[in-house]
A protein has these predicted regions:
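Helix-to-loop junction immediately C-terminal to a conserved catalytic motif
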Residues: 64
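Conserved ABC transporter NBD signature motif
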Residues: 72-82, 90
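Conserved ABC ATPase "signature" region
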Residues: 120, 130-148, 257-258
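Conserved ABC ATPase signature
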Residues: 153-157, 161
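Conserved catalytic motifs of ABC-family nucleotide-binding domains
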Residues: 174
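A short, surface-exposed alpha-helical micro-motif characterized by mixed small hydrophobic
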Residues: 220-222
Length: 270
């Protein structure tokens, strides 16, 4: 396997079986994900786009080990992705930034406790109050927040500040792959631009890879290195970003392009 590949997905499927009625003898099958294969390279922003229900969220859950796959394989840096293997400690290496900064933080805990907790659990720092506060303050500084934020509760922060806290919490265990699940859809435009700039800077600084899950092609155009288009649980097309926007190969990709109200084909400063 190419050493430049951080994540490899091969023939990944997730099927759900159900009965339509109480009198059905045979179960029906919903193919939420059906034979998906792709690779994510080191230090790459790999965008996964598609309409609601195309399988984007199911894909992220499978990568994170939050649901069992029906078939297929997932490899992280050439090794089978097995979250039960404590020696490999994959949970520390793969993190997710959730869509909603309002519900992803515990309203009853101070910020420093939430940021430092993963580091304590993974043996990065000791479970001492001073160590936890100092560690959280350092992480907050890395995402553009003041040290005093460490003693705040989530309700005391704006949406943009909460999302920055979410980023700091993800980075506290020094991940190599970060899944961004619609990271700015709950934020206004100006704050979204700040968060996206921050994520880009952190990628360049830390050498991480991103799987950027979104339905917004404008953001994909400005941020992603490659684009993966999904529909009905399958991959329709994978292409370099510029190639995708200049000449989409699949009819569904062209439909997505046409559905955009407007798009700038230059890369403005966000």
């Amino acid at each position: 396997m190419d050493e430049n590949v951080i994540l490899s997905v091969s023939g990944l499927s997730k099927h759900y079986k159900y009965y339509k009625t109480l009198f059905d003898i045979k179960k029906n099958v919903i193919k939420a994900l059906d034979g998906v294969s792709f690779e994510v390279f080191k230090n790459e922003i790999f965008a996964v786009v598609g309409e609601t229900g195309c399988g984007k969220s199911t894909l992220s859950k499978l990568i994170l080990g939050l649901t069992e796959k029906t078939s297929g394989e997932i490899y992280f840096k050439g090794e089978p992705l097995d979250y039960g293997n404590k020696k490999k400690d994959f949970r520390k290496k793969i993190q997710i930034l959730f869509q909603d900064p309002y519900s992803s933080l515990n309203p009853k805990k101070k910020i420093y406790k939430m940021i430092s907790y993963p580091a304590v659990k993974n043996g990065i720092i000791k479970n001492k109050k001073k160590d936890r506060i100092d560690f959280a303050a350092e992480q907050l500084e890395n995402v553009g927040l003041s040290e005093s934020t460490a003693f705040s509760y989530p309700h005391m922060l704006s949406g943009g500040q909460r999302q920055r806290v979410g980023i700091a919490r993800c980075l506290s265990v020094r991940p190599e792959l970060l899944i961004l699940d619609e990271p700015v859809s709950a934020l206004d435009v100006s704050i979204s631009a700040q968060i996206l700039n921050l994520l880009t800077d952190l990628r360049n600084k830390n050498g991480m890879s991103y799987i950027f899950i979104t339905h917004d092609l404008k953001l994909v155009r400005h941020l992603a290195d490659r684009v993966c288009v999904m529909y009905g649980g399958k991959i329709m097309e994978i292409a370099e970003t510029d190639d995708f926007f200049n000449a989409p190969a699949h009819p569904y990709s062209k439909t997505l392009m046409e559905s955009m109200e407007s798009i700038s084909f230059t890369r403005p400063n966000l």
